[in-house]
């Protein structure tokens, strides 16, 4: 059984202007997530939902000033961002970043290699990736496109759920994953999340408004 423990977490937003002071957002957050649990964190805009997500993941604009985040007893705050991912943490952002010049195919296989510790065999990987894309109604041609470049909101979200299914993290933090989705896209994304959780027992934290 895996456990994610957030203990007395304080965090602040680091301003882009170095002449401005950091803005404290989180004040002593405590949360424990055990295997098989789904948690929904609800609150108005500006209440700190995204701050909690990004701070745990290690975003440089969000500085943790006090507390611990333990994944199976290991303090994530002592790890670099890539080490947190390899430890089993996954973040789906509200506004996924576009990465021109890097194809989805290369990104996904490189990410899987980093997380799994070895490169998946080409034939097996192609079968695995195509199957996951089919389940999310992603056109195979998208694998040759640059990451999120020119994607619709629904396509970006499906790409993130595709990553979730292929990387198989211990814990997934989904930041307002329903934002900007129409009814059909929301259904596909929701089914993808439910399907993955049923198979792998991933434990989801869902910041939402």
Predicted features, each with a name:
Residues 97-170:
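ABC-family P-loop ATPase nucleotide-binding domains
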């Amino acid at each position: 059984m895996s456990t994610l423990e957030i203990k007395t977490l304080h965090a602040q937003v680091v301003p882009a202007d170095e002449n401005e002071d950091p803005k404290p957002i989180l004040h002593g957050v405590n949360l424990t997530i055990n295997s098989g649990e789904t948690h929904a964190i609800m609150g108005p805009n500006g209440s700190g939902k995204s701050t909690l997500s990004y701070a745990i993941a290690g975003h440089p604009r969000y500085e943790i000033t006090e507390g611990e985040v333990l994944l199976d007893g290991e303090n994530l705050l002592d790890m670099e961002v890539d080490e947190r991912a390899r430890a089993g943490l996954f973040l789906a952002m509200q506004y996924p970043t576009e990465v021109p010049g890097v194809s989805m195919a290369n990104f996904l296989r490189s990410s899987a290699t980093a997380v799994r510790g070895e490169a998946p065999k080409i034939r097996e990987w192609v079968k695995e990736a195509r199957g996951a894309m089919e389940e999310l109604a992603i056109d195979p041609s998208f694998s040759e496109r640059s990451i999120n470049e020119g994607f619709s909101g629904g396509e970006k979200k499906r790409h993130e759920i595709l990553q979730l299914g292929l990387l198989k993290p211990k814990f997934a933090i989904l930041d307002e994953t329903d934002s900007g989705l129409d009814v059909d896209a929301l259904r596909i994304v929701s089914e993808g999340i439910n399907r993955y959780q049923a198979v792998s027992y991933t434990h989801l934290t869902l910041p939402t408004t």
